[in-house]
Design a protein with these regions (language model features):
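Compositionally biased regions
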Residues: 5, 19-21, 25
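Bacterial N-terminal signal peptides
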Residues: 10-20
Length: 138
């Protein structure tokens, strides 16, 4: 049975808006992060999300950072280094949780690091954030 164009367009619109698409468009950010990793790029503002695969001890040298590893849908891993001197810690973080992020990507051989996931008190750097269980940490 062939659908007329008058049925196809409303059906397409209905289907397009009934799908639960994450706000970060994970596929797009995953491909941006994969390209940044492959090209060894740094200093990129990026938004995305991933699943916590490992929780690491805090880095307490200099500014304190909460650290954990996210696995993206494309398999790439990212170290999240979240400055807990400037932003609240995610206290209820567990392996398997989803975390959305917006921050600065820095290349390394293990997949990269995202930092600047907080506000900048001096206002010179774009503010970043983490989102976990509906709460934003900035």
């Amino acid at each position: 049975m062939k659908l007329s164009k008058f049925i196809k367009i409303p059906l397409f619109i209905f289907l397009a808006f009934s799908v639960n698409i994450p706000a970060s468009f994970a596929g797009e950010s995953d491909s941006q992060l994969a390209a940044a990793f492959e090209n060894q790029q740094s200093n990129l503002q990026i938004e995305g999300d991933g699943i916590v695969s490992k929780i690491l001890p805090d880095d307490t040298n200099g500014s304190q950072h909460q650290r954990f590893i996210l696995r993206l849908t494309n398999g790439q891993t990212l170290l999240i280094a979240h400055n807990i001197d400037l932003a609240p810690r995610i206290d209820d973080l567990n392996v398997g949780d989803t975390v959305q992020f917006y921050g600065e990507y820095e290349w390394n051989s293990k997949g990269g690091v995202v930092h600047w996931t907080h506000h900048d008190p001096s206002g010179r750097h774009e503010a970043g954030w983490l989102k976990h269980n509906g709460q934003i940490y900035q």
